[in-house]
């Protein structure tokens, strides 16, 4: 697999997400649950040609539906939902020859300090033999939910942007969303697979780096 610059991928994802309409978060009770956010984000979208724009999400979409219905997941799939802490993770593992591959997708939800908004994150990562190996769809995306409109829109984060601006072109970076706490771990990977970590600190409405 050709390794793509994560900065380029991030920029492309930003343009695509910014062009999308707001995502409606449907819910039954007085306020949406974490599961409602997941369902809304994973819902397929279609272009003017009638083709699905998010086929790359079919794996996690299918695993989520199976998990919700209590059905057995496909071989290699796992899905963990921690609704109390607003965290979910999907993993798909497979082998090709002597290599072991894994797709890992994390989702997380934060309540903003103003009490009027929430921040939803979707974090896609790909690994080969335990090392980060970014592909076409890797990256961290944020959606900001407005209680008044019951919808969420793409929301760039200044802290994440600062990470990409600072890092060396020869270094890749991945993110680890929190299952406990509110801060995000940034993992920097050099060309030899050595990694160092820094923290993106939650500030009540986004992240500071």
Describe these PLM feature segments:
Residues 1-23:
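Bacterial Sec-dependent N-terminal signal peptides
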Residues 20-110:
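Terminal domain-start segments
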Residues 29, 50, 86, 96-100, ...:
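Intrinsic-disorder/low-complexity loop/linker signature
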Residues 100-105, 120, 129-140, 169-171, ...:
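Short, surface-exposed coil-to-beta transition loops
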Residues 104-114, 172-180:
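Structural signature of eukaryotic scaffold interfaces centered on beta-propeller domains
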Residues 151-209:
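Short aromatic loop motif centered on NTY/YTY
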């Amino acid at each position: 697999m050709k390794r793509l610059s994560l900065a380029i991928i991030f920029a492309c994802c930003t343009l695509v997400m910014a062009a999308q309409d707001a995502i409606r978060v449907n819910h039954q009770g007085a306020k949406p649950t974490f599961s409602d956010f997941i369902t809304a984000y994973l819902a397929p979208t279609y272009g003017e040609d009638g083709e699905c724009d998010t086929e790359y999400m079919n794996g996690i979409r299918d695993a989520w539906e199976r998990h919700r219905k209590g059905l057995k997941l496909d071989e290699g799939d796992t899905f963990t939902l921690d609704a109390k802490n607003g965290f979910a993770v999907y993993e798909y593992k497979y082998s090709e020859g002597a290599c072991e591959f894994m797709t890992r997708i994390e989702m997380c939800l934060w309540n903003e300090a103003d009490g009027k908004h929430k921040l939803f994150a979707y974090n896609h990562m790909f690994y080969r033999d335990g090392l980060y190996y970014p592909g076409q769809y890797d990256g961290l995306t944020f959606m900001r939910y407005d209680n008044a409109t019951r919808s969420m829109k793409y929301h760039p984060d200044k802290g994440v942007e600062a990470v990409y601006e600072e890092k060396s072109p020869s270094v890749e970076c991945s993110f680890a969303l929190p299952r406990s706490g509110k801060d995000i771990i940034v993992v920097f990977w050099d060309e030899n697979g050595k990694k160092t970590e820094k923290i993106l600190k939650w500030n009540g409405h986004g992240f500071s780096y």
